[in-house]
Regions:
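Short S/T/G/P-rich N-terminal loop/turn motif that feeds into the first structured element of a domain
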Residues: 1-91
Length: 91
């Protein structure tokens, strides 16, 4: 399953996290069963999830509905970066 990592700067970590925790239905539509995330000083967040359908994930991520909830959560859109992990290193 493809693993996707998204990083972004937000206006307020508490506001973002409260909003993020309410978006379970949206994540399910993206083919994600579990989202892992971290926050750091400076109001930066990182979100990671595995999806069963990368096309659906991308379609929903790029939708106006997702842009709306990200704005409500205080995500600064110009800082959003997405990484689809497609390489690995066996050690």
């Amino acid at each position: 399953m493809p693993r996707v990592v998204i990083t972004a700067e937000v206006n307020d970590l508490g506001t973002w996290e409260r909003g993020f925790r309410t978006h379970g239905d949206l994540f399910k539509q993206m083919g994600v069963a579990r989202m892992e995330y971290a926050t750091v000083t400076g109001n930066w967040v990182a979100v990671c999830g595995e999806t069963t359908d990368l096309d659906a994930y991308m379609k929903i991520f790029n939708s106006p509905a997702t842009a709306e909830v990200m704005a409500i959560d205080g995500v600064k859109p110009e800082t959003v970066r997405m990484f689809v992990l497609d390489k690995s290193l066996d050690v």
